[in-house]
Amino acid sequence: MRLLWGLLWAFGLFASSLQKPRLLLFSPSVVNLGVPLSVGVQLQDARQGEVVTGFVFLRNPSHNNDRCSPKKAFTLTSQQDFVHLSLQVPQSDAKSCGLFGLRRSPEVQLVAQSPWLRDVLAKETDTQGVNLLFASRRGHFFVQTDQPVYNPGQRVQYRVFALDQKMRPSKDSLLVTVENSRGLRVRKKEVRDPSSIFQDSFLIPDISEPGTWRISAQFSDSLEANSSTKFEVKKYVLPNFEVKITPRKPYILVTSNHLGEIQVDIEARYIYGKPVQGVAYVRFGLLDEDGTKNFLRGLETQLKLKDGKSHVSLSRVELEGALQKLRLSVPDLQGLRLYTSAAVIESPGGEIEEAELTSWHFVPSAFSLDLSNTKRHLVPGAPFLLQALVREASGPPAPDVPVKVSVTLSGSVPKVPEIVQNTDRMGQVNMAINIPWGTTRLQLLVSAGSLYPAVARLEVRAPPSGSSGFLSIERPDPRAPRVQETVTLNLRSVGLSRATFPYYYYMVLSRGEIVSVGRERRQELTSVSVFVDHHLAPAFYFVAFYYHKGQPVANSLRVDVEAGACEGKLELRLDGTKDYRNGDSAKLQLLTDSEALVALGAVDTALYAVGSRTHKPLDMAKVFEVMNSYNLGCGPGGGDSAPQVFRAVGLAFSDGDLWTPVRETLSCPKEEKARKKRSVDFQKAVSEKLGQFASPEAKRCCQDGLTRLPMVRSCEQRAARVLQPACREPFLSCCQFAESLRKKSRAESPGGLGRAMEVLQEEELLEEDMILVRSFFPENWLWRVLRVDRSETLTVWLPDSMTTWEIHGVSLSQSKGLCVATPARLRVFREFHLHVRLPASIRRFEQLELRPVLYNYLEENLTMSVHIAPVEGLCLAGGGGLAQQVHVPAGSARPVPFFVVPTAATAVSLKVVARGTTLVGDAVSKVLQIEKEGAIHQEELVYELNPLDHRARTLEIPGNSDPNMIPEGESSSFVRVTASNPLETLGSEGALSPGGIASHLRLPTGCGEQTMTLLAPTLAASRYLDRTEQWSKLPPETKDRAVDLIQKGYMRIQEYRKSDGSYAAWLSRESSTWLTAFVLKVLSLAQDQVGGSPEKLQETASWLLGMQQADGSFHDPCPVIHRDMQGGLVGSDETVALTAFVVIALQHGLNAFQDQSAEALKQRVKASILKADSYLGGKASAGLLGAHAAAITAYALTLTKAPQDLQDVAHNNLMVMAQEIGDNRYWGSVTTSQSNVVSPTLAPLSPTDPMPQAPALWIETTAYGLLHLLLREGKAELADQVANWLMHQASFHGGFRSTQDTVMAMDALSAYWIASHTTENKELNVTLSAMGRRGFKSHILQLDSRQVQGLEEELQFSLSSKISVKVGGNSKGTLKVLRTYHVLDMTNTTCQDLRIEVTVMGYVEYTRQANADYEEDYEYDEFLAGDDPGAPLRPVMPLQLFEGRRNRRRREAPKVAEEQEPRVQYTVCIWREGKMRLSGMAIADITLLSGFSALSADLEKLTSLSDRYVSHFETQGPHVLLYFDSVPTSRECVGFGAMQEVAVGLVQPASAVVYDYYSPERRCSVFYGAPEKSKLLSTLCSGDVCQCAEGKCPRQRRALERGLQDEDRYRMKFACYHPRVEYGFQVRVLREDSRAAFRLFETKIIQVLHFTKDAKAAADQTRNFLVRDSCRLHLEPGREYLIMGLDGITSDLKGDPQYLLDSKSWIEEMPSERLCRSTRQRAACAQLNDFIQEYSTLGCQV
């Protein structure tokens, strides 16, 4: 008995201990910086009347338990035993308690402190806590861009909306960053905007690779809170119409014995909504999970569109036949996708657009099942809710689908009846399954659909059984609630025979915080109502618990809220649903429910057709997604134990005995899903060949070998160009394999079109399709923010595009937060309109055919009158205004041809007008750019102005009369006078001009090294202006422009960065030591301006250390510049110069090592510098360095503070080589060196002579010398002399010769000007006098250094005028002359060493020759007829379009018969002769023939394949720039195709030039012309258009054509009255020559009748006469002519005048003696002789 009583006493004591009072502490498991922390404190099992008081706060257990927040008091009683507190987390407290210093375990402790814990519960301390994860994230950000996709080179406009945790506007400062497609940060900006809407823009570099860019925003003090938006960058042009491919069923059902129907609809509509009439070409293929595409042969089809629509069906037999060719069967299709491509050709304009369908899956079932919302824990004895979501195989919810559930239970009832229920409209089904008591496991087999159902299995287990029972949460209405609705939840305890707890306690959690807490008295069925407001959207957790016998029992449930509207209101309304016309105004009404800022933007919906489907505009779905990202819960709810339940919903919990472990990460653990990867083994020759190579690199090399070039090369020749040996073998093997396939294909083909078609199908397997479309007006507009108080009506004027605009609106309100409106669509359309296409440019007197297309979408036929409005400078039919009558049937389109001949070199506005009999009509105005004949030529002269030297106070600048100058061409001498003030070179006209110094170099900026010219000179200028505080002397916007230029340069250079921190001239190349060092040096100086990452610069420095050799020198595996010719007493100094260059970069790079964590790497860098200094010192001591190597070595040793003896040796060596003449000191070539390629430059013979312009290498060398002197001696006499020479080497626009010399000269001069800065006033007075058209004219310039303006002046003079200059004042200055004019012919002596040759061939002739060289005579374009690119062609077969689009820049379909666009083949050959070497890269700049554009696909092949022929290419208007690494001694030729976009006749020769990039004075320039006997050289015009074009042409008079009818003395009237000639000669024609767009006739004077300027004219002298090629005048060599006219402005090589023959010239053939002896002509001959005698003797008697 005693034992029994003892056991009963012990049990009672144990039970009483279980029922002891407890303090429960609840909190979100994550603490966010600056965001109030919601805390729940509950008093459990307290005695009646008990009161507990205390505080809650946060502390850092890793930092002496320092408090991280203020204390928050609480009071608990037995009646009010659950309180909800808000605990502030200020940034200042978090910082002071050391939270920011936590790195490995960012944990913080939530503590409840109360004496009750110690006094009543007898704990050792008065505290109880739980550990939380600390995160610095807070708030919400939404980033919006003005477009979803951009072209490289376009400007991106974006907005950032900043909101706090409550979705209200935040005014805290933001950090906005931009990442490029390779994940590199290219822009960082810290901003603060009181409106909470930050707006900015930036320019995407034009050399950017295609890919996805990202704009991210975060609070400056909470860097973990990061929200971003993505946008796509790709080369595109907007489509004119959109093609859609819509399958009848979004999936294809396939099983072992079944294949579902394959039916697809093709629809084509213009962007403004109207259907397209034309033809569709459709083809099919298979896609595996990796996206590998394999076409299904034989399924291609051609369809005619009716009302813009067509339909395609594939039968099982057709598909099986195509699969057999791939050795596949129908069951093999599961897991693959059916690729469908459609190309639609519009009938009226022949334009082509395409679409692809890549999401058409072969599936075993029509549906998919998602059971993720179903709990994984059951409550025995309570209903279990199965929540399933059924989707169609293509993704959307599937309504009204039967769902069958088979249930297997453990325990006494193993199986329950099958349950069947149909899905609701959202594709959801909710089934309550009654679970008997005692069930421990539930197995569910769920199937959706009756035929070929989707099946899913789920096993659910009960939590471990206990004496405290289970808590069941049941939803009577399981559907998702909406905002403003109430959710009812029933609570029930299960498994308790006798429940003793009085209350259920519950919490509602949403977005990572406890929204509310409460309790409900326990009943048989306890109901809790939760009102759903905006704070609970888009989902919330309901958590309930009770304590029984001291044990917590809990359960939870996630409730998804149906996504609806925003908390506030924003509605966009347009005035009606009517269509608008371009240029109309529209009224846009903005409706809100409170005062708000509304951000607007309108985007062309055509962009959605161009961009990826993943880049969508901001909408409320994205807003809810961001809001839900703060939700800390994982899964649908429930758990094995109370702590697990709390942890699963994102709660931290402690009751003193139990607690939840600290959360590890912010995100939920991801479920691992088994993914079956399926690939298709296609037994095709090409696939087999590719399959022979395992590595991706070898496969790429093989793919390149399979690709055919746009020029003739054998496989062996191609393989020899592949640099990597590992790539060379697969490349050669695959190239030879492809050639054998082509030969085999030719042998098996019957010939003609079929043969070409087969080749096309084989070739298209070798590369991905390039889809390019044509441009059509603006892409976005209406980018503005305005304040709206409930209603605002905005009148907007619509752009000229005919398209559908989508207007987006986002509002931000202080009371309602952010709201994204449903976009408003606005269609801009004209039922009748016309479309005009113009070439990029055309030359004067070329003939242009315009073909405006008239579109009629009315229901009636139209007769339209179409004309081109008269405009000066254009020859038009009837002088302009002469109309053509065109019949345009309803619903059709018609082209109308017009012929135009430009006669003036200018930009003219060409207006095409179409009028109908009713109010129907349209007009389009576009600018036609007309250029002069020949090529532009520029030359510069630089004079030093020194009023302190009496010899230099007056000087004369001679005029220029180049014999090569084009007659009637504009020619001028521009004169710029500057004082000796740095602001001229560095200011708003120099390095800080809108385009920077780089824009003045007249050089391209395509490679990595060239890109630095956007950055380095601007940094030098900014550094000078910051140091001398002179920004105020420049225009106010100059500082902003400098920041913009620096940001652009930084973004651009990041495109060349590799993952290891190194840089390459091209991303496809190996990294360059020299370029990497150059970037490190510049970016180290630009850290503050660009916001670059120091860690990235440290990576760059680390890479450079790996390039150092054992002796301390550096080597370059892929040099950008070859400096082995730069001079030196013996041999090459390249290694020395490179080592010094890297040392300089590393020294500057030490600025990036401020962080203590990088100290070890910093010491390695310093050790590397010391080692390199030792190497450089040894080379300097040997005394064998050339000037360039000596200068850079001296500067490097001085900069790094090397041992003084090494510095002295280097200094002395350098000064020995200096050349000093007058006040100038510089370093050029060393005359004793054998490796110099430039002869010494002499100083001017006298102070009034122009300064000779030195080559780029001399300027760079002298710049290093100046930097060395400034570091060693400061501003002294030597530095003054060097700087004086350097300043006078700058070009007219402020730059120097090339990139390196410009960068270094600007760097050196800015350092000099900082050292020599003075506030002393300087004056320079200059008087310039010259003879002008209206007599002698003088200009007086007074330049004062204290004036903001007036630092420089620019004047224009006639090219031939002599300019007298007088100088006064107390300051030196510079006078620069820029002469510019157009030339007939390229005469350049450098062509003796450097050569370029350009030939243009008709594409058919080229194809024949190419095929002959390939030993095959086919090509898919072989069916072209004749050699003339303008000749009629045979009809185009459908599949040729798919290959053809790769070769066309524009998406223009081939036309039939006379409408076929001509295509030509360009061949560009370069080589060098003699021993001349280049410093490195050479650039060929080819100006295309008028109307042509290069085929980008051809140019891409030259640069992107393994056998690379060109490093890079650029297209700029009519120019194609090709970058070559070097110029060989033998001819190196590359080829590409070009397509004529607009018909042009009488095409004039165009120019081409090749030059050494680093020494541009080494160049060769040539003209080239169109193919002989080509239509390009024929006349297009007719009638009065031709007469107008020839209006300026001379008329040739036949011998004695008027006979005796000379009573009016018409010869004498022409000579003396109108036009009154200035010369008269009787000449004999010696020869005829072609000069650019002119013909030159060399003649011998027989008799001088009259002269004005030509005082030296005499018998037997020669004179040249020029006439335009477009004129029909023809003078026969050997015959004599009487020629009279006006004096010319040009001279020949001997200085004698040459004359232009035009409409004011008299040309009469002299009669032969035989003709004059005839009786009929004897008198007429006498009259002619009398005129010659009288005019030569007496002249004009008036």
From Swiss-Prot:
It is found in: Secreted. Disulfide bonds join C68-C97, C634-C668, C701-C727, C702-C734, C715-C735, C1469-C1533, C1581-C1586, C1593-C1671, C1616-C1740, C1716-C1725. There is a cross-link at C1007-Q1010 (Isoglutamyl cysteine thioester (Cys-Gln)). Residues 701-735 form the Anaphylatoxin-like domain. Keywords: Cleavage on pair of basic residues, Complement pathway, Disulfide bond, Glycoprotein, Immunity, Inflammatory response, Innate immunity, Phosphoprotein, Secreted, Signal, Sulfation, Thioester bond. The record marks R755, A756 as: Cleavage. The modification Sulfotyrosine is found at Y1414, Y1418, Y1420. It comes from the Eukaryota. Prior to secretion, the single-chain precursor is enzymatically cleaved by plasminogen (PLG) to yield non-identical chains alpha, beta and gamma. During activation of the complement systems, the alpha chain is cleaved into C4a and C4b by different proteases depending on the complement pathway: C4b stays linked to the beta and gamma chains, while C4a is released in the plasma. The alpha chain is cleaved by C1S to generate C4a and C4b following activation by the classical complement system. The keyword Disulfide bond applies. GO terms for cellular component: extracellular region. It holds the Pfam family ANATO. Residues 1593-1740 form the NTR domain. Residues 675-678, 1445-1451 form a propeptide. SMART domains: A2M, A2M_N_2, A2M_recep, ANATO, Thiol-ester_cl. InterPro entries: A-macroglobulin_rcpt-bd, A-macroglobulin_rcpt-bd_sf, A2M/Complement_sys, A2M_N_BRD, Alpha-macroglob_thiol-ester_cl, Alpha-macroglobulin_TED, Anaphylatoxin/fibulin, Anaphylatoxin_comp_syst. GO terms for biological process: complement activation, classical pathway; inflammatory response; innate immune response. SUPFAM superfamilies: Alpha-macroglobulin receptor domain, Anaphylotoxins (complement system), Terpenoid cyclases/Protein prenyltransferases. Glycans are attached at N60, N226, N861, N1325, N1388. The keyword Transcription regulation does not apply. Residues 1-19 form the signal peptide. Precursor of non-enzymatic components of the classical, lectin and GZMK complement pathways, which consist in a cascade of proteins that leads to phagocytosis and breakdown of pathogens and signaling that strengthens the adaptive immune system. In absence of complement activation, circulates in blood as a disulfide-linked trimer of an alpha, beta and gamma chain. This is Complement C4. It comes from Cavia porcellus. The gene is C4.
